[in-house]
Amino acid sequence: MRWILCWSLTLCLMAQTALGALHTKRPQVVTKYGTLQGKQMHVGKTPIQVFLGVPFSRPPLGILRFAPPEPPEPWKGIRDATTYPPGCLQESWGQLASMYVSTRERYKWLRFSEDCLYLNVYAPARAPGDPQLPVMVWFPGGAFIVGAASSYEGSDLAAREKVVLVFLQHRLGIFGFLSTDDSHARGNWGLLDQMAALRWVQENIAAFGGDPGNVTLFGQSAGAMSISGLMMSPLASGLFHRAISQSGTALFRLFITSNPLKVAKKVAHLAGCNHNSTQILVNCLRALSGTKVMRVSNKMRFLQLNFQRDPEEIIWSMSPVVDGVVIPDDPLVLLTQGKVSSVPYLLGVNNLEFNWLLPYIMKFPLNRQAMRKETITKMLWSTRTLLNITKEQVPLVVEEYLDNVNEHDWKMLRNRMMDIVQDATFVYATLQTAHYHRDAGLPVYLYEFEHHARGIIVKPRTDGADHGDEMYFLFGGPFATGLSMGKEKALSLQMMKYWANFARTGNPNDGNLPCWPRYNKDEKYLQLDFTTRVGMKLKEKKMAFWMSLYQSQRPEKQRQF
């Protein structure tokens, strides 16, 4: 009788412990580096445990500027993890970009610091013995010069799909990608930060209820390009098991800086650090304050259209380099050789990638006065390095896209100009990458997202999906802002389900959703909108045109799809 009473008390205590784990307002987890105390929130009746500002590296300050990240210092006692960490130092429009992607009812203003190697974790509350959950690690976009983990809210996706979400951030711009193309500054610091975060996930995510053996990378724009690049990096092998690239791959022209020493010398010149010795140059830049480095960054005028400058001298961004270690070779060469991670890959584009956000940031004049064929030709001339075309090919592009357009139809001219940029960059790079992964025998799923979100209030309404619009639906924006209609909520649920299914199994289908065909030789893809449809051969004729241009430039690297 006595042992029955003891056992009953034990079971009662276990149940109370489990219940406490589910409902405590100040959840704690023990990581490899120390104990964290987070906070609990609810999505409907589902409790979500949130841990903010979790260090995955030592602060990249002093001698660690322009150096690989190092593991974080362990701490004693309980570390508070209830405050959003500062984003990495970045361009001033990073705050605007953060407002654009935010799905919170009230916007959280970002802070910025060079001490920024932190991540945020959103995990469904669990009872002891519950099975481990799939892990999804988000890579922010921002042209490698803006972006922050705290711009994103993960509670809806984590709660509705029972996944553990990790939002990372990494060094940006000069801090993240300065390279002298030698041992004094090899570059790719931002990519190394990403891999340090992924190693932290492998070591610690089980404490949050996540499965380190089921990690999916997903990201947008520059984040999507980074993921595509990590799929070609031997240093990232074993750190993830599936990958999703939204509006960007490593074949995007912006991903690789082809002459990093030239860029480093320009940075040094603007900073007053000119020197023939790259060692002295780097040490001089390392000694500057973060504020001074950002003043130099502002003078570089990244991502700015400039009609007065020689297009060959325009530096669009600071970005990764082929260093032989992190990125062993040109991404196109690696893809051609099939040197990619053997993991399922889901990727896609939006149908109006160059509609408002990017033209606004890049100061593209798309107003009525500027929309003339002569002005568009000048724009193409100025952006030809971004579009990856030669000056001799500019007239061919004008003929292909503008030949049958009335000179006075400024709206059609604007639409064609937007088509040129998105086709030459996002669409071409995405489709080519999909083909190479498919031909390597890997599962590939392709999409085109087509719906503009009513809840994105910082830009004008359009009839299609601008760059980044899909994130509003992926992170449950229609449920958070109160500005969406029922159909948008249904689309959001559908997207969350597709993405989470892919994270669970490597296949977005589950029998309850419209079938998403695998991307094979028939080139079928999913058109995501209120009515989901299957398309075939996305922009086939235009892609054939761009293929012919690029083949004529470097036939030794290109091949037909």
Curated annotation (Swiss-Prot):
Its main location: secreted. One of its GO terms (cellular component) is extracellular region. Keywords: Disulfide bond, Glycoprotein, Hydrolase, Secreted, Serine esterase, Signal. Glycans are attached at residues 214, 276, 388. GO terms for molecular function: carboxylic ester hydrolase activity. The active site is at residues 221, 353, 467. Belongs to the type-B carboxylesterase/lipase family. This is Carboxylesterase 4A. It comes from Homo sapiens.
